[in-house]
Every structure is written in C-alpha cells, then in structure tokens.
Amino acid sequence: MKTFSDRWRQLDWDDIRLRINGKTAADVERALNASQLTRDDMMALLSPAASGYLEQLAQRAQRLTRQRFGNTVSFYVPLYLSNLCANDCTYCGFSMSNRIKRKTLDEADIARESAAIREMGFEHLLLVTGEHQAKVGMDYFRRHLPALREQFSSLQMEVQPLAETEYAELKQLGLDGVMVYQETYHEATYARHHLKGKKQDFFWRLETPDRLGRAGIDKIGLGALIGLSDNWRVDSYMVAEHLLWLQQHYWQSRYSVSFPRLRPCTGGIEPASIMDERQLVQTICAFRLLAPEIELSLSTRESPWFRDRVIPLAINNVSAFSKTQPGGYADNHPELEQFSPHDDRRPEAVAAALTAQGLQPVWKDWDSYLGRASQRL
C-alpha cells in the first residue's frame, strides 16, 4: 500500500532548495497568470524572486478566497486536555524533560472548560494534548468525546498519531477532523529535535494523514513548524507536495493548512531560519493559489496587527483567545502552557476587527438536525 512516504523518498531536499532559489521573475509572472498551478509554479511563488510580486500575489489570493468562501471567516478555539507528554522535543513546552506542573483534565474539569468556551460563543473545538498514549490515549478519548460531541458543532483533534482503526473508531464517536503537523520534512533535522519517545519515528508521523484518509476522517490538517529547519521555503514546498498527494489519493476528505511559526516556550530553542511577516504572507497566498478550495488557518501565534491585515487576504479559519494550557479558560495558569500566544484579544474583539473590514465571522456552520458525516455514512 503506497503512502506519502513513497513520494517523499523521490524528493531531494537540496535539489528543491536549488530549484526554488533559481526561479526568476519570469517564472513568478507565469505562475501568477496560471489558471492552475504546477509544482514548478508553486516553487516560483515560494521563491525569493516572488518577494517583489507580493501585492499581485495577495490580490489574486484575495479574489480566489472571496470567490470560494465569500466574506466568511470561521472561528475555532483549542481546548487543551492534558500537558502530559512521553516525548522529549527541543521546541515544545510540554516536553517530558521540562520541569513543569502536569495536569490532565477530568470530567468535571472538561465540563467547566466547555461551559467557559461556549459562553464565549465558540462551536468549533480543537482538542489538544501532549503525546502520552498510556494516560491520554484511546481510553481517555472514548470517555470524553461523546459528552463533548453533544455540546459542540465540530470536534477536531491535535494529539499523538494513532492507528487507522483508532481513527475510524473516533470518527464514529463524533470526530470531524485531525490536525497533524510533520514539524519538518527534513529527516536529519527532525531527528535532532525529537530526542525521546514515539515521536522519534519520522515515518509513523509522516504517514499519519494516509491513515486518516483511509479511515474516512472528514478534514485533515497539515503544516510544518516554520523555523525548525534551516529552510522554511523547502519545508513549505514539502507541505504542498503532501497536500497534492493526499488530494489525489483521498479525495473524499477536506484539507486545511496552517502556518505556525516557532514561538517562545519553556526550554525552547531559537528558530534555525527566520520567516518574516512579508514572507509569511507570501507563503499563505501561494497556498491559496495552489489550492483555492482548502481551508487556510492562522492562529494566535501571530500578532493582532498582523492577523487583522492578513486574514482578509486569504485566511478562512482563525482561533481567538487561545489558552495553550489545560484548564486555561476556567482557571488560567500560564505556567502550564505549551507556548505563549501573541494575540490575546477576546473573541468578540477579533470578530469586531474583522466585521469592520466587511468580513462575516462564523461561529457555527451546521446544526445537529442535519446529522454528521459519520452518521450519514
């Protein structure tokens, strides 16, 4: 059974780097005028040569976004269930080597968090944990997903990679989507930053979206942690390759791409490569031209000033007032957090800023009487 690993083995990191850096202004102009991007076009739009075409790139990305999604921007919020982790990663505040207080939410904790989140108006929930299969694994998810499903319109997860059969079971329990970020597609760099635990297995993580597709999960989220490798352009191109593979082989699923830049955290590292804000806009808009139909997400890792200016261009899914520690909404303890968010505005403030620009915040985009995909299938 083929997976993206087979395609990944055909891709040479250094060759891609040279090809991206070798793109010219003529290549960029050709890509901007293409009705459907080729892989070469995507390289051109990620290249240094495209930096002088940012306005044209943003204008086309905005047109495509409005054509596909209108003026709507969906809101979601992460609910951190646990900061227990059995991995040792150099860049994460939850890393097992960090001496921080550990907490896993029980049924009462989850009820308090859910009430606080619903009071703010959120209906789309992203469940996040550290990666600890023994204590925050399938038994934990089986206990708590049904109650959360009853309260929220959409449930997605960002947890440790699971088996195909486990994803199929979670789908029956009401799971709509899974976000799984490769962190970096450069295998040697990946090994340097994942020192202990199951996350050391590069290919188990790389093939997770294939397992999600085979399990019939409705939405699959991809991304690289920008700044972990020494070349964000190549990592971003690898995300594009991954997306194209999945769309070809699991066309029934929907896809999203996120653009997390390395943020400060307990015991964290400095970025190996710096993507500035103009380059982040360039990358976001390139993905919109590559895949006009997918969801592009921007989290509270970015500043309020930046988010208010970039969301109207190509973003159609945003978080707001994110707390990156378990219990953060009902009882805030910053010392437990995974990383420090940059945009700490309340959701109504973010919504007001977008409304002032003619956008329509969407808190809920379906109702229970319509059924869920897992029920209909």
Curated annotation (Swiss-Prot):
Give the record's keywords alphabetically.
Answer: 4Fe-4S, Iron, Iron-sulfur, Lyase, Metal-binding, NADP, S-adenosyl-L-methionine, Thiamine biosynthesis
**PROSITE patterns given for it?**
RADICAL_SAM (PS51918)
**Which species does the entry assign this protein to?**
Escherichia coli (strain K12)
Pathway listed for it is:
Cofactor biosynthesis; thiamine diphosphate biosynthesis
Q: Give the miscellaneous note.
A: The product 2-iminoacetate hydrates in vitro to yield glyoxylate and ammonium.
Binding, [4Fe-4S] cluster: 85, 89, 92
- Briefly state the protein's biological role: Catalyzes the radical-mediated cleavage of tyrosine to 2-iminoacetate and 4-cresol.
What is the annotated quaternary arrangement, including any partners?
Answer: Forms a heterodimer with ThiG.
The top of its lineage is:
Bacteria, Pseudomonadati, Pseudomonadota, Gammaproteobacteria, Enterobacterales
Top-level EC class as recorded in UniProt: lyase
Q: Know the name of this protein?
A: 2-iminoacetate synthase
User: Residue ranges of the Radical SAM core domain?
Assistant: 71-301
Catalysed reactions listed for this entry: L-tyrosine + S-adenosyl-L-methionine + NADPH = 2-iminoacetate + 4-methylphenol + 5'-deoxyadenosine + L-methionine + NADP(+)
The protein's matches in Gene3D superfamilies, at most eight in alphabetical order, are given as: Aldolase class I
Q: Write down the superkingdom of origin.
A: Bacteria
Check the record and name the CDD domains matching this protein. Answer: Radical_SAM (cd01335)
Q: What protein family does this chain belong to?
A: Belongs to the radical SAM superfamily. ThiH family.
For biological process, the GO terms are: DNA damage response; thiamine biosynthetic process; thiamine diphosphate biosynthetic process
Q: Which GO terms describe its cellular component?
A: 2-iminoacetate synthase complex
Give the Pfam families listed for this entry: BATS (PF06968), Radical_SAM (PF04055)
This enzyme's EC code(s): 4.1.99.19
Cofactor remark from the record: Binds 1 [4Fe-4S] cluster per subunit. The cluster is coordinated with 3 cysteines and an exchangeable S-adenosyl-L-methionine.
